[in-house]
Amino acid sequence: MDEMKVIEIIKKTLKFSNENIVKGIDDDCAIIKIDENFYLVATTDMMVKKAHIPSILSPYEIGGRILTANVSDIASMGAKPLAFLVSISLSKEEANEKFIKELYSGLDDFSKLYDCPVVGGDTNRGDELILSGTAFGITDNPIYRRGKVGDDICVTNDLGRVYCALTLYYMLKENKISYKEFERLCQKYPKIIEKLRKPIARIKEGLLMNKLINGCCDISDGLGKEITYFKNFEIYSDRIFKLIPEDVIEFCDAFNLNPIKVALNSGEEFELLFTTSKFNKVKDSLKGYSKIYKIGKIIEDGQFIDGEEFYGGGYIHKW
């Protein structure tokens, strides 16, 4: 069983709603109508140590990461962050003052970056570190995962660095390289390891694009998975190649990786994948903040890459 099947079971089981719920399961955030002009958006994301937290991350970086992962969903809705709740389960290893202070220092610094204060949560004891965050935002125009036929499909900035960083991490973890070699490679590819350690949610971009785009989601599970939420599309590998940074190309050459597959499968990038019929206006609105790249089009029917059936990608939890 995979997470998509689990979600389908949950959706079929949960039947009750009310007139305040505009959108529940099936988008980056739930959308709740406050009044005629504003919507509350809410999202939750969880990090489990063994599944999500590389051992090379510091407690400070873990704190920043859980906040970024949640706030990135707020960004994809074109909303302004309001507040953040975080619940933690600590094992004996983490239940000490040093770890807790560092973790919450990361949360505090990133909350200032996103203007999203941490306002509460819960604490518990467990066998391993687990963090569960809930972020709230507000908007007058929530952006869904969708597109209109003919829309350009676009991505902010670049993709691939997180995949490369995790490749290095697993090489170290599986004893394929020494720690000394790992440190050398981190120094050789500083931007690659930095994207893993300190990812940034595109809050400003989401707000600036709000009235100019038709659909959006954040790239948390990889472009290859997120693109399928837009249902019918054609994307092009030569365009995807243009948003792959030089250090990722160099890394792929050094370690015999396909850069297109790396870009499609690189998760937790937290860039924005969006659809628009106003590419030039979006580009102008983001000057000084982010570059954007066209990678394809919304079409009438089907999912294709370079004219062939799309083979998918990205990360899906499996049991």
UniProtKB/Swiss-Prot annotation:
EC number(s) on file: 2.7.4.16
Enzyme class, spelled out: transferase
Binding of Mg(2+) 3, residues: 28, 73, 218
Binding-site residues, Mg(2+) 1: 44-45, 122
Residues binding Mg(2+) 2: 45, 73
Signal peptide stretch: none
Entry protein name: Thiamine-monophosphate kinase
Organism: Methanocaldococcus jannaschii (strain ATCC 43067 / DSM 2661 / JAL-1 / JCM 10045 / NBRC 100440) (Methanococcus jannaschii)
Gene transcribed to yield this protein: thiL
